[in-house]
Amino acid sequence: TSGKYTAKRTVAATGSEHPAPRYYQTHIGCELASLTNGLQGDSVRVISGNPLTGTHAASDGYLGGLDHQITLLPEGSEPKFLLTAGWLSPGLDKFSLSKSYPTWLLPKSKEFVMVTNTGGEERAFVVTGQYEPVFPFDIYPVQLIKSIMANDIDAMEKLGIYEVAPEDFALCEYPCTSKIDVQDIVRDGLDNLKKELG
């Protein structure tokens, strides 16, 4: 075998906070500062990868070894007044999958700025029907997650644990009213299954 190793990589610099979103020709493990145009500050979250499965990186950190994208999003940590920007506000600038805000009546061409704020803390995990519209497979994601949390191997197998990977549940974390880390739960379930069936 012969060949030439190249460490070159094309990286997409994305996100609403990036001053010049575009593709960069760079190399594996490059400094993120070279891709963020030196953007600094606590108000921006730098993600090595995409917003759903990427990892939080320092602005002076490095590109992940398997990543082909960096994302810059507003941190969303500033306090909001209850009536003007909090949960009692009319929410005319907020995106909602559950039609909690009247923005679902607006034209589909409206663009929203997504922030990293979860909008609350972890809550009880209940069946709400929010996962199914965004889940890419024809299985019952909520029941599968509940069986993983209960460590019920028979139920996990019947519900299709062997067909999924943690990344498949990434989009489920966005509309989740329970604010739980679904990908971590699925990863733990797969690890427990491997250990049990070893």
Task: Locate the predicted segments by residue.
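Hydrophobic alpha-helical positions that pack around
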Residues: 1-52, 56-99
